[in-house]
Amino acid sequence: MVKQRLLNCDIVDLLHDGRGVGRINGKAYFVEGALPGESVEFQVTTEKRNYGEGRIRSLSITSEHRVEPGCKHFSRCGGCSLQHLDHQQQIKFKKTQVLNSFERENVMTESLLTPINGSQWGYRRRARLAAQRAKDGQFIVGFRNAGSRRIEPITECLVLDDSLAALLVVLPQWLQLLPTDITLYEVELVRADNAIAIALEASRRLKEDELKDIRESLQALGEPPIQCWWKVGKNGQFRRLDEGADELYLNVPGDLKFRFKPGQFIQVNGEINTKMVDQMLRLVSPSSSGVAVDLFCGAGNLSLPLAKQFDQVIGVEGLNSLVAGAAQNAIENEITTAQFFTADLTQKNSLNKIKEIPKSLDLVVLDPPRSGAIDIMHWVAKSGAKQVIYISCHPSTMVRDAKHLLDAGYKIKDLGVLDMFPHTAHVEAIALFEK
């Protein structure tokens, strides 16, 4: 075990995860809770040969951009990491992260877009909570402590949608209705535009006679309507327990309804998602009306708005359930120009097997996970698409993938940052490539 000790240093930068960076005799220390421009005393928590880690104890010089965190759980909850930094400075930090990622690889852009931002509080329409029954039978519900498996009991969350935040107060008591032999693994709260969903991942199914109290109690939780969904184990499928149709929906730009189930991917920040879709549509060439391919399409978040402009849209996703959801969303929105296919986008030749993709493309859109799209970038680069729009949640993999496009003769026309997750170090970016 490392002997804990106190050190002092000046903070000169922010690391990608929001920790302050200081140096002592040339050795870097990453200090949780510290900001550039500050002189801090910190407790060393990790000591390696090339670097150290620590947690701030006190300040002798304070940054002009430091603010009082709004949440009483900040620094213990593993959710937010930047509530102590002024929000506009958070956006500046994220913009710098994206630009530095590109500049390190000598990749330049012709134009910088104005950062897309919105409400800094109450923006999350989805949360995954840990839950555990204590020895006294009461439930502990909250988020994991930063760097730990311990659950931090949460009674408020300022970044959650107000209706979800209100549930945090009553949720532990409501869970007491569950049979005592059931182990609860995770609780997902989702705010759709028509209802709230409480989705529970548990160790076994509920029996019919155990459902009565659950169903009746949902009505007592008030408005908006609350649905209860249930699945057994991580590999199970969510099924609705209460009376009603199996549907949740979100409104997306273009007067479209996007239906989904708990467990399926949605953008958690509805306001920024709307602005992101609008940004994407503005970046598309006004003369484009032919064929667009949407890779990592999910359940159609980008495909369906694109279908309003293009003669043909082809969406590709790795999960059958999402592809089925996208196809159903197209039907329900009376869109006949969109087709959806399942393909493993971590396999290099997967797209060659989809014969329905024409040889002449106007647009390719990618919105991959953090790991990026390295396995299909050769296909994208050789597709001949006039435009490529890449939406990324990890700037480093975005730059790596962008090199394939640059080598094929594309240039970055526009680059911008989306503040999808205020008060966290999470960075979202959008880039337009053209030939």
State where each predicted segment sits.
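Hydrophobic beta-strand signal
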Residues: 41-43, 128, 293
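Terminal RNA-binding accessory module
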Residues: 1-73, 340
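Rossmann-like S-adenosyl-L-methionine
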Residues: 2-8, 13-16, 205-435
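Short, solvent-exposed loop/turn elements at beta->coil junctions and helix N-caps
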Residues: 113-120, 186-189, 233-237, 417-420
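Carbohydrate-binding surface patches
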Residues: 189-205
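Short, acidic/hydrophobic/Gly-rich beta-strand patch recurrent on exposed beta strands
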Residues: 20-25, 142-145, 326
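Extended interfacial segments that mediate partner engagement and assembly in macromolecular machines
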Residues: 57-69, 75-184
